[in-house]
UniProtKB/Swiss-Prot annotation:
UniProt-listed GO biological process terms: cell wall organization; peptidoglycan biosynthetic process
Membrane topology value: Single-pass membrane protein
Protein name according to UniProt: Endolytic murein transglycosylase
InterPro entries reported for this sequence: MLTG-like (IPR003770)
Transmembrane segments: 188-208
Functional description taken from the UniProt entry: Functions as a peptidoglycan terminase that cleaves nascent peptidoglycan strands endolytically to terminate their elongation.
Topological domain ranges for the Extracellular compartment: 209-551
Disruption phenotype: Essential, it cannot be deleted.
Keyword Coiled coil: no
Species of provenance: Streptococcus pneumoniae (strain ATCC BAA-255 / R6)
Keyword Transmembrane helix: yes
Length: 551
């Protein structure tokens, strides 16, 4: 502590003592007003004695208070008590002074019990040595305090210490600002990084969806075809560009990446008829098949005619076609066209060898063109009509028989006779071996003027051929039916074929197996055919392999 601070402490203590003395004077005036009520005995201490007691008490307090060393250059009294005695005039003390005297003086100067005196205010003094001077709260200061009593600083030195402590705390808190700024920078970085990750994730998700969408068909409901030519030597990137320009894919680059990812490396050149309803996967599979050397008309549908179908069955199959065709392809229109004499005449002129022996109008044939439409799969295009479709089937039969025309003629057979025999062979046998044996039986019976006795012809006459016929129904057929197709009663062949025979049945009928067999019966449950060269053996085969299974 500096010397200046010590001097200020002494002066402050002095001022406090003077205030206490002024307080004593105030108490003296109060006691004078109360003398009318309370009278003290004759031996009551005088004001001078009370003042002496007060000074003794102050001296006692000062002796117990810690001393503050003074600077040698300053003329400061050795003790605060001496300074007060020199500067303070004698003031009579009031009996109600609440400052206690020393124990010695209190025991020696006070008389015995006397009349009741005003109760003295008790005060507590800090007897613990301290390095700061003790201050008292004056009456004026107490009067100014309206609210609850709050502790008052002991000295100005304490205030200085507290102010210094506050300043040091404030000054010590200043270096924390860079930490806050650093934390704010870190927080901003973390937020920015999280936003970046969110944007990156969103971009990846939408990018993935964009690629998937690019692999889907351009128009899933489109039925139109687009003709595209892929030049020889084109790489997958060039093919993707070509397809993008044709409006078949959204992005050629994505198409090429997908082709490489799926390892589609064998894409072929040529002309293709592709649809916008095809996905990227469908386009790649189509490009693997290879295109045509020249542009072809797009195929809207395919028509498959099974082997052994009758014209009625073929008409029904045509009527099931669906597509945006040039004209309506119905079963009724098909049957009407195959019976159109003008169309038949044009066909005979177009395919003279094939239709040279075609049944005449009054032959009793149900359909003159029955058996002349080759069973196969046909492409139905936008320009396909009923007439063009029938013509295509006739052309297919003419093409397949062209290799056998000379052989047929050498066997003294007409095309109509060959196709009629082949139509029966088609239904009677399933295996090529059996078909050749059955064809041989028919030739043997024809050569002997024996009726063919084929149930197939009777079923056709009844309009049941092609239907699911049980073994019992087959055995119970009406062999007395009045029809040119009743080969049980009529000797020789029917007016014409009863179905469209397969190429295998045709070849089996041309190259039949020669034998002396005149009879055969098939066990439909086992698919086995039993042959005989006489009626007795044949009847035994029928009883054993057919009739025994009817029960």
């Amino acid at each position: 502590m500096s010397e200046k601070s010590r001097e200020e402490e002494k002066l402050s203590f002095k001022e406090q003592i003077l205030r206490d003395l002024e307080k004593v004077k105030g108490y003296d005036e109060v006691l004078k007003e109360d003398e009318a009520v309370v009278r003290t005995p004759a031996n009551e201490p005088s004001a001078e004695e009370l003042m002496a007691d007060s000074l003794s008490t102050v001296e006692e307090i000062m002796r117990k208070a810690p001393t503050v060393p003074t600077h040698p250059s300053q003329g400061v009294p050795a003790s605060p008590a001496d300074e007060i005695q020199r500067e303070t005039p004698g003031v009579p003390s009031h009996p109600s002074q609440d400052v206690p005297s020393s124990p010695a003086e209190e025991s020696g100067s006070r008389p015995g019990p006397g009349p009741v005196r005003p109760k003295k205010l008790e005060r507590e003094y800090n007897e613990t040595p301290t390095r700061v001077a003790v201050s008292y709260t004056t009456a004026e200061k107490k009067a100014e305090q309206a609210g609850p009593e709050t502790p008052t600083p002991a000295t100005e030195t304490v205030d200085i210490i507290r102010d210094t402590s506050r300043r040091s705390r404030r000054e010590g808190a200043k270096p924390a600002k860079p930490k806050k700024e650093k934390k704010s920078h870190v927080k901003a970085f973390v937020i920015s990084f999280l936003v970046f990750l969110a944007l990156l994730s969103a971009g990846g998700y939408f990018g993935y969806q964009y690629v998937l969408d690019s692999l889907l068909p351009i128009d899933a409901n489109s039925k139109k075809y687009v003709t595209v030519g892929i030049p020889e030597g084109s790489n997958v990137q060039e093919i993707g560009t070509t397809l993008e320009k044709a409006g078949l894919v959204k992005h050629g680059l994505i198409f090429s990446f997908y082709a490489k990812y799926k390892n589609y490396t064998d894409l072929k050149a040529g002309y293709y008829n592709l649809q916008k309803s095809m996905s990227t996967e469908d386009l790649l599979k189509e490009l693997q098949k290879g295109g045509t050397d020249e542009p072809q008309e797009p195929v809207l549908a395919t028509l498959t005619i099974p082997e052994g179908y009758t014209l009625d069955q073929i008409a029904q199959t045509v009527g099931q076609l669906q597509g945006d065709f040039k004209e309506s392809l119905t079963a009724e229109a098909f049957l009407a066209k195959v019976q159109d004499e003008t169309f038949i005449s044009q066909a005979v002129a177009k395919y003279p060898t094939l239709l040279e022996s075609l049944p005449v109008k009054d032959s009793g044939a149900r359909y003159r063109l029955e058996g002349y439409l080759f069973p196969a799969t046909y492409s139905i295009k936008e320009s396909t009509t009923i007439e063009s479709l029938i013509d295509e089937m006739l052309a297919a039969m003419d093409k397949n028989l062209s290799l056998y025309y000379s052989t047929i003629k050498s066997k003294n057979l007409t095309v109509n006779e060959l196709l009629t025999i082949a139509s029966l062979v088609e239904k009677e046998g399933a295996k090529t071996e059996d078909r050749k044996l059955i064809a041989g039986v028919f030739y043997n019976r024809l050569n002997r003027d024996m009726p063919l006795q084929s149930n197939i012809a009777i079923l056709y006459a009844q309009g049941k051929l092609g239907q699911n016929i049980s073994l019992a129904e087959d055995v119970a057929i009406d062999t007395n039916i009045d029809s040119p197709y009743n080969v049980y009663k009529n000797v020789g062949l029917m007016p014409g074929p009863v179905d469209s025979p397969s190429l295998d049945a045709i070849e089996s009928s041309i190259n039949q197996t020669k034998s002396d067999n005149l009879y055969f019966v098939a066990d439909v449950t086992e698919g086995k055919v039993y042959y005989a060269n006489n009626q007795e053996d044949h009847d035994r085969n029928v009883a054993e392999h057919v009739n025994s299974k009817l029960n």
